[in-house]
């Protein structure tokens, strides 16, 4: 199945049903009181995280979702039926952004997580709500409000413990093939990897971690060169990054400059991502020999001013790969399992009609208590529209 990690959808919640103006009419009861019921609330729209999905391709074709409108109120104090909700399934790891405001509506990080993204309109009130000691036969009602409309950007971010960085042909796909059952394509030309891939590294029967391989970066990626930096977002939730440096580039380029390119592109993309724990891994030591590899590695470390630990491996021959994986496993075990992305939790999203119910009923009660003022035609100051019927 084609991997799609971005999609834009339109969600429209259902409108609220209108209130009803009606009076009780039965035999021997010529002057019955008001019995107009309230309308039904509009349907809401939810997102549901599903671990069985791994792409957003479905929403490249179906881009609009509309919930059901609430039914109008009826006589005999019958409340209108509530509109049906809509639930949209998305892969675990999906981030939801409001295109209109730019706010993060939520992060779908757990299987079964449910998130409301559009709230249905509030129901209108029937004339029964407006009866009082000074208004025995109210002929006013309120209309249902409109449901929320949002244009959402869905971004799928892979959930991995370890992320891999490097130029094209640095050996990232070879490494992930060596340590896991994943089989990304490997060839001797740039950009063999076109989409992100995940591999599970099993150290023993009880311990494992997930590693993410993304397409290689090149200089100018932040300006759109190559495949750009659109795949770097998949590393935001990783707890540690492995920066692979080719000790023997096939194009005879300078490994120091190659390493600086990746560091520079990382900083231009996100300061938070640039500050993540990052390990330097020198690959392809089998092509230059152990002694020459050590000399080149030390020269690169000095040129970069690197103060952390570095590793020397051959992903193709699996030299020193197992030791690196165990160090990664021990590092992950020593870190909290909280989300690695270092940003504040999104604020609570305010929906259009959150306080509508309380405000509207408070207005009705205030009108009922005001015995010296029964002018129901007075314009409402709070914007609640009353409809009068004769």
Swiss-Prot record:
Disulfide bonds: none annotated. Residues 363-390 are annotated as: Disordered. GTP binds at residues 166-173, 191-195, 213-216, 283-286, 314-316. It comes from the Bacteria. GO terms for cellular component: cytoplasm. Residues 160-333 form the OBG-type G domain. Transmembrane segments: none annotated. Its EC number is 3.6.5.-. Mg(2+) binds at residues 173, 193. Its main location: cytoplasm. Residues 1-159 form the Obg domain. It comes from Yersinia enterocolitica serotype O:8 / biotype 1B (strain NCTC 13174 / 8081). Belongs to the TRAFAC class OBG-HflX-like GTPase superfamily. OBG GTPase family. SUPFAM superfamilies: Obg GTP-binding protein N-terminal domain (SSF82051), P-loop containing nucleoside triphosphate hydrolases (SSF52540). One of its GO terms (molecular function) is magnesium ion binding. This is GTPase Obg. Keywords: Cytoplasm, GTP-binding, Hydrolase, Magnesium, Metal-binding, Nucleotide-binding.
